[in-house]
Amino acid sequence: TILQNIAQGKYNDVQVASLITVFLMRNISVEELCGFRDALLEMRVPVDLSEFSPIDIVGTGGDGKNTFNISTAACFTVAGAGIPVVKHGNYGATSVSGASNVMEQHGVKFTSDVDQMRRSMELCNIAYLHAPLFNPALKAVAPIRKGLAVRTFFNMLGPLVNPVLPAYQLLGVYNLPLLRLYTYTCLLYTSDAADERSSV
């Protein structure tokens, strides 16, 4: 697929930027979003923290408000209240306060060591997954997204590809059309009666 080729370095930066730009000129369809999601999940480094029944609290980013990272702050609050949280995020592509920027400033050392994440869950009720460590395609597009400095369809994909596949998710979006798109996407992915995943 396209994302697998990106992950394997088969396209140069100009070609990848061109692909991203296509979806700035027209809206992405549900089918395209689901296809990209499937490809990213297929390439992910899987992480099993299901014993904690965690929630992911995440926003798409790209709202242009330049606020502090509210979803990451909410993760700390929820974890402090005793609810297990598995946060999946990245450096800001359109802002200075992506989840990874916030975590790094708080001294978090990014890791893909599942045992270390499990210890973090046991001690603090929270584990952080820095997206590029868990998906080669997200790592490959990161500098291109930063260079474009505009909201792209990767803002939409990020919240859908947490490698833990958490049981619950609280998701913030930047506009009503995107909320509707996510609603259709979640309905497609809840045909197995896993109703928690539809609580967008």
Across the structure, where does each feature detected by a protein language model lie?
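Glycine/serine-rich anion-binding loops at beta->alpha junctions
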Residues: 54-96, 154-155, 161
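Active-site-proximal loop->helix
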Residues: 92-108
